[in-house]
Amino acid sequence: VPNKLDMNNIFCRAPFMHLYVGYDGRCRLCCVSKPNEKTKTLSAVDSSNFWDYWSGEYLTEVRNDMLNNVPRKECEPCYTIEDTGGKSFRNAFDIRHSHIDLQGKELFFPNDLDIRFSKLCNLKCRMCSESISSQLEKEIANNYSVLKQYRDQITQPVMSENNFKKILGNINSIDYIKVAGGEPSIMPEVESFLQAFIDNNRHTGDNAVNLLITTNCTNQNTKFEKLINQFSNVTLTVSFEGIGLVNNYIRSPSNFDILEQTLISYLKKHKCILNATIQAYNLPYLIEFVNWLKYINENFGQLDAFFMLLDQPGELACYNLSKSLRNYYVDMYLENIDFDATWLADSNLKSSLELLKKDQSEISNYRFVHRTKAFDHVRNQHIKDYLPEVFEDIQETYTTMAMPS
């Protein structure tokens, strides 16, 4: 019997072995897939809905489409990346689990989990939402007249205690755990979750789980670090969008100098990967960012990077900048950045820039400016003091736009 899993370029292993639970408790195929109205929410008290999702109609349909080379709308982000020559999450899943021959069947219990336990966070990043950041939720509530259109509060818990127990009851079936937030290093649920793996002897030795944690590097939580230092297979995905004032503006209220020192400390103990979005706020400053990456790699240890074009919220995507500004910087980067450098080889930076170059769309900057000025207003900031090249591009709209008191 031929192995159908190798017969097409649509197939992805994620629906057969991976479980993603988002900030709202809703499952998706993976963290980059588009949502589908048929997906289930795992925040109900009854844990039976876990099996409703994993063995249910929706995932059965997706798996059959994968095996029959039928594209899925949810998977368009990966198709787009691959069409431009980039490395997609689909590629990553195939490489990570290539040793497992599924023979067209899902695993009894997913061996690869991606869980967001809560929205507890200590940052209020410009591109984030209050469903992901508790700090942003507070800021919007305290400045509702100015920020009300950026409200998308989700009050339900991400996961019920029963579903949490269901996962821990299958702890020996799990090979990969990814934890994101919010900020995992300050979440008590994450501490309990990691301790369960230690108590079950899944943290080290031949049976050690692969632990992947996304962190903003803002603080070195002693208790959290003691926990992750007990795991033998740890990868930290560190979130940066730029250096210096660019970082401080986008990822408020962080201080880049502190982030850098925390990152250097992590590099001494763990494998780290830098994750960054390319967006309207940081496009003019990528060359400085790349030069800093070179500096870190040459002086403190290997830090591979992964870039993705920001598409949500749409008002912060690169297409909100003028076409002339975009083309100026994209052309300069394509000509001057050494994309063959080890830390950029699989970064998707070149393919992302080529996609920007190919798509000459230009939209009104009104929504971009409104979001920018609204948060500037409540934070007592001005974009010109942080991102002068971006301000110059939007100056006319920004200067004339009124803000509610």
Regions found by a protein language model. Give the residues of each.
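Radical SAM enzyme [4Fe-4S]-AdoMet core and its adjacent flexible, acidic
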Residues: 1-48, 116, 137, 229-230, ...
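Membrane-interface junctions of multi-pass transporters
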Residues: 5, 34-80
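Local cysteine-cluster metal-coordination motifs and their immediate loop/turn environment
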Residues: 28-32, 71-83, 120-130
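Recognition helices and adjacent regulatory flanks at domain boundaries
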Residues: 77, 83-112, 121-123
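Eukaryote-biased activation of long, low-complexity terminal tails and linkers
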Residues: 147-162, 175-177, 193-199, 204, ...
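Leucine-rich repeat
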Residues: 163-170, 196-204, 227-229, 266
